[in-house]
């Protein structure tokens, strides 16, 4: 074998001479062989020596192989790992050298010579005998300078340390940690740190821990001791180098056991840890090092169960169960646990636990533990070598880890914080705002019923389902899940004794928040975080950027359109009433007593000033249990009046606010928290006044709500103040059809109190318990464009309620109404309610009245050729109102304003996509489809009552839906209130046949109604629905140029709001954030190229801006 062909031979020949020989060149092969033969003996010795050295190097490299790979490394693996390390060091060196010559960091660096480094080291090491200073070069890795006392601390010779690489002193398993924390680009300058007041308290870099050994004898067993290292960047000018070279100055401090002198005080033996749901350490506090003996890198990535005593490991299952139970609450304490230290002994820890919940997935992301050492270990030297090897039960640990992981995989539905529980994170402990909760202030309170809230993912899924699959398929899917909850909500018996215990101070204060029967209790509103609100704001902005066409109609004109964008605009008049409500929240409430008595209890009813002020401009919900959604504006006003949280008003700025404060990190952090809080408050006000206000309400998706026409012994719900609890009420029963010949004995006792022999409106009608009738405060003229009629001023309402109330049939005695505009919400298109009645949620709770009859006889009748339009936008269901409105008495003003809607019309928002209906129940089929198509129906059939759950009474058949018509009434029926046969004076009204002993019959009737609902198919109803009512959503394509242009305009408007800093503030900001000089602004050209290959007008405008000038400026200069 040719010795020159062996790659282990030292490279004495140049590549030009050796290369052709390796390629097989015959011309040079002879001379080379002659030279090798002449010097064969000497080269053989050199080859053997080099082989031995190479073997020793390979064996040494195998010691530095990563400890994660449990298999014994081969020679090839060790060489590949060494090659990767060399490439990594070269890349770091080249990167730093390319940054230093022209970067801003070179100008900030201070150059030191060796004498200055010696004085610097002696200055800092004299204060602590366990600390030394070591300076090593980033280019060569060798020590440039080391303190004199380092040899004594490391128990080695001075000359030995000066000739070493600093990495040679480290334990092999800590080399990677050392390199990760000493990257030159992330180190602070030493001269910047020396300007600090304290050396250790205000250190700008996070310290790390490594094990360092001393001694130069390879035969002795190395003993590594833990050290705390603080790295800094310096430039050193040495005689051997013509230019200053970058170096790392490290302050190295030896760590002693916390239980040996000088001992850590008992009350300060505290540290924190963080681990995943799989019980794997994520972070360990540096205070744990002298208490446990483990370095942070020893624990991170390992299981916490490995270090617990085998008998204490099952306790972690109970701990995590309690973590899941107390999510969002303050940290809780559990049983003490025994934790193994590095020397093998156990310490007893008193631990408190809390968790962090991901606000999007609603799952526990990690668990935080705060531990305090109760009992110290037997061997106080926690860094001592472990004598006996710990026995590990891998199977038991794995089984417990899987059990805990499965436990924490379930989402959290409680009103939990989206931050660190109660650990003091910004915005995590805000006051909860309840915009949907309402209850009675009674003496007997029960705990609030919990129900699952709708997460953001469910909202996204529902929106995508509507857009992609279609409205009909969405209704069908919701139908399957609506039957079972309906059956569960109708099991409580009806009671009459609890109707008398309501507090008179809460009668009408929060009347608009009545959302269901007494059993449909709602939990308090979850307080969303800044990130959640920001995401929802983006979703709403995306949805509102669409332009939706009008409904397709055949009745008048197929091309008749109505813009839905005006419906989503906030009403300026409503905003004014909101500001008035905010001012009312800060003054004591003055209540005006209404001299009315309940029919049974005789409890006096009072009117809150805040509630009265909202009655004129905000739609009031009925006391009936049919109302599902609350008008967003009203909900916010009442929530502010009832909860301790109030809308933030602009406070007067005091002189203290203008005190000059330096721009420090604390000031920037406080400013960021303040801006986030202001954004959350503004967004909450915006979202509650928008058509999408239902996203922040905890609405039950499948809770059924029923309405009895005359109250059927119903007890209305009243809002309560925060801190009080709710009283459980008996549920209202399903309404039943009543024949026109029914007498007053068939009505519930509540109604008999409302219908005396004189047939006039009793004062108790205005009370919240009189749920039988409620006139709308803003009526609509039945034309293509709805016109508002008058709403009387607020001060005219209160005095009237008793005395000369208008009779039911007296139409000629009422004064005419004025036609002035009033602050009422915008109306939707004229046929929106018809569509929503058929395909969306609620069917109307009274049939389409014939042309010759009106539900309000004293207001006249509607012509046969006109269609009854809608009531205000918050109640999109169809309510027939007359056009020829006659005079009306002033006494009916309060009845109009206190009962905004008919008690059987739910208050809903008419947003373009009807997104608020995603959380509600299935609609019932429409009873008046053909009646709408034919205008007026001469033939009449009796229709049954339907509730919000979509159930129908037994007399209704599916085949009769398309041909159902309304029974005609004679004009004399309008004045037949004296017969007390029905509340509206009509046999075809939705009246409730509830006798005094009718509880059992209603239960039987309700069960049959629900059983029939499950058998019907929604497609049978859709097939019989006229085409003029059906509508399909068509989402048009958005103009990209328009959207980009609008975004650009908004960005330009935001530029004026950028903070302007003075020169002194810029310098102070640069001192806090030193990187701000070296990192330029991002290039706009790359963003434009990544956006689209086609350049639009907006992109061309952006590209024409002077981008180069912006790139040359640092962030400080741009400020």
UniProtKB/Swiss-Prot annotation:
Residue span of motif Nuclear export signal 1: 54-63
Compositional bias (Polar residues): 429-442, 491-515, 989-1001
Extent of motif Nuclear localization signal: 720-739
Biological process, per Gene Ontology: circadian regulation of gene expression; circadian rhythm; entrainment of circadian clock by photoperiod; negative regulation of transcription by RNA polymerase II; protein stabilization; regulation of circadian sleep/wake cycle, sleep
GO MF annotations, alphabetized: kinase binding; transcription cis-regulatory region binding; transcription corepressor binding; ubiquitin protein ligase binding
Ubl conjugation recorded as keyword: yes
Post-translational modification: Phosphorylation by CSNK1E is weak and appears to require association with PER1 and translocation to the nucleus.
Phosphoserine PTM positions: 907
Renumbered residue ranges of the record's region Disordered: 1-48, 419-449, 483-530, 718-744, 878-910, 947-1011
Motif Nuclear export signal 3, residue numbers: 400-409
Region annotation (CSNK1E binding domain) ranges: 551-750
Ranges of biased composition (kind: Low complexity): 419-428, 970-988
Pfam families from the UniProt entry: bHLH_PER, PAS_3, Per3-like_PAS-A, Period_C
Motif Nuclear export signal 2, residue range(s) on this chain: 913-920
Family matches, as SUPFAM superfamilies: PYP-like sensor domain (PAS domain)
GO CC terms of this entry: cytoplasm; nucleus
Feature: compositional bias, Basic and acidic residues: 885-903
Region span, CRY binding domain: 1037-1119
SMART domains: PAS
Predominant location: cytoplasm
Keywords in alphabetical order: Biological rhythms, Cytoplasm, Nucleus, Phosphoprotein, Repeat, Transcription, Transcription regulation, Ubl conjugation
Subcellular location: Cytoplasm; Nucleus
Subunit structure: Homodimer. Component of the circadian core oscillator, which includes the CRY proteins, CLOCK or NPAS2, BMAL1 or BMAL2, CSNK1D and/or CSNK1E, TIMELESS and the PER proteins. Interacts directly with PER1, PER2, CRY1, CRY2, and TIMELESS; interaction with CRY1 and CRY2 is weak and not rhythmic. Interacts with FBXW11 and BTRC.
Known role: Originally described as a core component of the circadian clock. The circadian clock, an internal time-keeping system, regulates various physiological processes through the generation of approximately 24 hour circadian rhythms in gene expression, which are translated into rhythms in metabolism and behavior. It is derived from the Latin roots 'circa' (about) and 'diem' (day) and acts as an important regulator of a wide array of physiological functions including metabolism, sleep, body temperature, blood pressure, endocrine, immune, cardiovascular, and renal function.
The name this protein goes by in its record: Period circadian protein homolog 3
Organism: Rattus norvegicus (Rat)
Upper taxonomic lineage: Eukaryota, Metazoa, Chordata, Craniata, Vertebrata
């Amino acid at each position: 074998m040719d010795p020159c062909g062996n790659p282990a031979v030292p490279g004495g020949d140049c590549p030009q001479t050796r290369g052709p020989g390796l390629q097989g060149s015959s011309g040079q092969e002879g001379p080379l062989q002659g030279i090798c033969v002449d010097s064969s003996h000497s080269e053989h010795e050199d080859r053997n020596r080099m082989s031995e050295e190479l073997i020793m190097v390979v064996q040494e490299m195998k010691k530095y192989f990563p400890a994660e790979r449990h298999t014994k490394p081969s020679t090839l693996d060790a060489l590949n790992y060494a090659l990767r390390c060399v490439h990594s060091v070269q890349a770091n060196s080249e990167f730093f050298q390319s940054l230093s010559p022209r970067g801003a960091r070179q100008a900030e660096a201070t150059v030191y010579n060796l004498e200055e480094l010696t004085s610097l080291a002696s200055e800092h090491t004299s204060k602590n005998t366990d600390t030394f200073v070591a300076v090593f070069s980033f280019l060569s890795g060798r020590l440039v300078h080391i303190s004199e006392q380092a040899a004594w601390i490391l128990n080695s010779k001075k000359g030995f340390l000066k000739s070493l690489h600093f990495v040679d002193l480290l334990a092999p398993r800590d080399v990677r940690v050392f390199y990760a924390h000493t990257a030159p680009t992330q180190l602070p300058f030493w001269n910047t740190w020396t300007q600090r007041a304290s050396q250790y308290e205000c250190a700008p870099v996070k310290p790390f821990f490594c094990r360092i050994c001393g001694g130069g004898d390879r035969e002795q067993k190395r003993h590594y001791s833990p050290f705390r290292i603080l790295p800094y960047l310096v430039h050193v000018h040495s005689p051997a180098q013509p230019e200053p070279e970058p170096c790392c100055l490290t302050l190295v401090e030896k760590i002693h056991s916390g239980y040996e002198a000088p001992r850590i005080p008992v009350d300060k033996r505290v540290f924190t840890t963080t681990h995943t749901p799989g019980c794997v350490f994520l972070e360990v506090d540096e205070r744990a090092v002298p208490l446990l003996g483990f370095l942070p890198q020893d624990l991170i990535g390992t299981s916490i169960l490995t270090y617990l005593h085998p008998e204490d490991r099952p306790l972690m299952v109970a701990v995590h169960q309690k973590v899941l139970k107390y999510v969002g609450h303050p940290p809780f304490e559990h049983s003490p646990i025994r934790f193994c230290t590095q020397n093998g002994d156990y310490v007893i820890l008193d631990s408190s636990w809390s968790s962090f919940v991901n606000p999007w997935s609603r799952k526990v992301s990690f668990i935080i533990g705060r531990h305090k050492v109760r009992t110290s270990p037997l061997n106080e030297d926690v860094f001592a070598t472990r004598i006996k090897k710990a026995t590990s039960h891998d199977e038991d640990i794995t089984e417990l880890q899987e059990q805990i992981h499965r436990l924490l995989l379930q989402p959290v539905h409680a009103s939990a914080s989206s931050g660190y529980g109660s650990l003091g994170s910004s915005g995590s402990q805000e006051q909860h705002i309840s915009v949907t909760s309402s209850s009675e202030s009674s003496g007997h309170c029960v705990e609030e019923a919990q129900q699952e809230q709708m997460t953001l993912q469910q909202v996204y899924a529902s929106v995508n389902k509507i857009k992609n699959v279609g409205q009909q398929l969405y209704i069908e899917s919701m139908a399957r899940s609506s039957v079972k909850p309906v059956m569960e909500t109708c099991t409580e018996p009806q009671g009459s004794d609890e109707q008398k215990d309501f507090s008179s101070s809460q009668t009408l204060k929060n009347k608009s928040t009545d959302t269901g029967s007494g059993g449909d209790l709602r939990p308090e509103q979850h307080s969303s975080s800044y990130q959640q609100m920001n995401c929802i704001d983006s979703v709403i902005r995306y949805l509102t950027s669409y332009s939706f066409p009008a409904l397709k109609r055949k009745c008048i004109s197929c091309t008749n359109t109505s813009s839905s964008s005006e419906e989503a605009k906030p009403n300026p008049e409503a905003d004014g009433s909101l500001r008035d409500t905010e001012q009312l929240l800060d003054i004591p409430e003055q209540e005006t007593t209404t001299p009315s008595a309940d029919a049974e209890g005789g409890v006096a009813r009072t009117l809150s000033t805040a509630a009265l002020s909202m009655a004129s401009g905000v739609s009031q919900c009925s006391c009936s249990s049919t109302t599902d959604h609350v008008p967003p504006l009203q909900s916010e006003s009442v929530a502010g009046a009832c909860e301790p949280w109030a809308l933030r008003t602009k406070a007067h700025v005091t002189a203290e606010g203008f005190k000059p404060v330096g721009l420090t990190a604390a000031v920037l952090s406080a400013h960021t928290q303040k801006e986030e809080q202001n954004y959350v408050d503004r967004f909450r006000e915006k979202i509650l006044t928008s058509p999408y206000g239902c996203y922040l309400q905890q609405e039950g998706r499948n809770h059924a709500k029923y309405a009895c026409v005359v109250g059927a012994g119903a007890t209305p719900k009243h809002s309560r103040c925060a801190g009080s609890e709710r009283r459980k009420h008996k549920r209202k029963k399903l309404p039943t059809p009543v024949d026109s010949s029914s007498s007053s004995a068939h009505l519930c006792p509540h109604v008999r109190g409302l219908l005396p022999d004189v047939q006039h409106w009793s004062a108790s009608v205005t009370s919240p318990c009189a749920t039988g009738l409620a006139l709308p405060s803003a009526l609509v003229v039945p034309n293509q464009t709805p016109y508002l009629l008058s709403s009387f001023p607020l001060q005219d309402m209160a005095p009237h309620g008793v005395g000369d109330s208008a009779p039911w049939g007296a139409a000629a005695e009422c004064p005419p109404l004025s036609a002035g505009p009033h602050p009422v919400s915008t109306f939707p298109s004229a046929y929106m309610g018809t569509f929503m009645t058929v395909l969306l949620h609620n069917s109307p709770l009274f049939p389409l009245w014939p042309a010759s009859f009106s539900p309000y006889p004293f207001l006249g009748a509607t012509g046969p050729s006109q269609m009854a339009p809608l009531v205000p936008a918050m109640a999109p269901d169809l309510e027939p109102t007359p056009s020829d409105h006659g005079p009306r008495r002033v006494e009916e003003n309060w009845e109009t304003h206190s009962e905004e809607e008919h008690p059987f019309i739910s208050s809903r928002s008419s947003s373009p996509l009807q997104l608020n209906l995603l959380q509600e129940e299935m609609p019932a089929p429409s009873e008046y489809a053909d009646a709408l198509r034919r205008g007026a129906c001469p033939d009449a059939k009796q229709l049954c009552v339907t509730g919000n759950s979509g159930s129908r009474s037994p007399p209704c058949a599916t085949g009769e839906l398309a041909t159902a018509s309304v029974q005609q009434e004679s004009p004399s029926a309008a004045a037949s209130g004296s017969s007390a046969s029905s509340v509206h004076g009509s046999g075809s009204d939705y009246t409730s046949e509830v006798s005094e002993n009718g509880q059992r019959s209603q239960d039987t009737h309700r069960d049959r109604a629900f059983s029939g609902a499950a058998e019907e198919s929604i497609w049978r109803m859709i097939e019989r629905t006229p085409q003029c009512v059906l509508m399909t959503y068509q989402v048009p394509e958005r103009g990209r140029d328009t959207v980009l242009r609008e975004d650009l305009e908004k960005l330009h408007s935001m530029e004026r709001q950028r903070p302007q800093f003075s020169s002194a503030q810029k310098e102070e900001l640069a001192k806090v954030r030193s990187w701000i000089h070296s990192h330029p602004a991002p290039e706009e050209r790359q963003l434009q190229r990544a956006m689209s290959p086609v350049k639009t007008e907006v992109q061309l405008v952006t590209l024409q801006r002077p981008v180069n000038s912006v790139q040359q400026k640092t962030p400080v200069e741009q400020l």
